[in-house]
From Swiss-Prot:
Reported function: Part of the ABC transporter complex CcmAB involved in the biogenesis of c-type cytochromes; once thought to export heme, this seems not to be the case, but its exact role is uncertain. Responsible for energy coupling to the transport system.
Cellular component GO terms, alphabetical: mitochondrial membrane
Organism expressing this protein natively: Reclinomonas americana
Protein name: Cytochrome c biogenesis ATP-binding export protein CcmA
Molecular function, one GO term: ABC-type heme transporter activity
Domain ABC transporter positions: 9-222
EC number annotated for this UniProt entry: 7.6.2.5
């Protein structure tokens, strides 16, 4: 897929409800291709709910998602996005290499498999020496890096990442920041939640809090 398919993405008056309770309301922001958008907030402020609504994994109670100035259905973005959950979930009894081969076949199609590229993604995340080890033997940080390695195998323009930095030390956070910037330079769009300072100059922050009323957007914070 051409990484400039989405020229602009607008979230308009999105409201999230969980267990008949309003978690957040009237969320509004607009992003251009090449944008990195970071969502911050305390536990319970609705970060994961918002990300899943944008991804089409949860229904929105009101509001619109607008792509290239066109209103779209909730499922429209699924073909253009990659969603990463905050909690790694794997088939634990297979090797790292077999897992990525299986995932790549399922996600990208058999004809698109490049075993060399898969091995390269493991190398870039410092996991090549573990490629024949079972996932069950990995630490939390290693599992998170395995999850991140899938970003290097996807051609999706929109990345939606829920707390991707949990379990990473400073060195791997720096490597991950480089991956994010490279994707943005190619015309990608990233929406992610994190409490960690990435020290990336060009980004936008959305601040959520648990009152469901105060929402602040800060452009080019650093």
């Amino acid at each position: 897929m051409n990484l400039t398919k989405i020229q602009n993405l607008t979230i308009h008056n999105i409201t999230g409800i969980r267990s008949n309770k309003i978690i957040f309301q009237n969320i509004n922001f607009s992003l251009e291709k090449g944008s990195l958008f970071i969502i911050q907030g305390s536990n319970g402020s609705g970060k994961t709910t918002l990300l899943k609504i944008i991804s089409g994994l949860l229904p929105k109670s009101q509001g619109d998602i607008i792509i290239n100035n066109n209103f779209i259905s909730e499922n429209y973005l699924k073909d253009s996005l990659f969603y990463m959950d905050s909690t790694p979930s794997f088939k634990e009894d297979i090797t790292l290499l077999d897992y990525l081969i299986y995932w790549n076949t399922l996600y990208n199609g058999l004809q698109n498999i490049s075993y060399e590229y898969i091995r390269t993604s493991l190398f870039q995340l410092g996991l090549s020496h573990l490629q024949n080890k079972k996932i069950s033997t990995l630490s939390l940080g290693q599992k998170k890096r395995l999850l991140i390695s899938k970003l290097l195998l996807t051609n999706k323009q929109l990345w939606i990442l829920d707390e991707p930095l949990i379990g990473l030390d400073k060195y791997w956070i720096k490597i991950f920041s480089t991956i994010l910037l490279k994707h943005c330079k190619r015309g990608g769009i990233i929406i992610m939640s994190t409490h960690t300072d990435l020290n990336i100059k060009k980004n936008t922050f959305l601040i959520l809090n648990t009152t469901n009323k105060f929402i602040q957007t800060l452009n080019n914070l650093i």
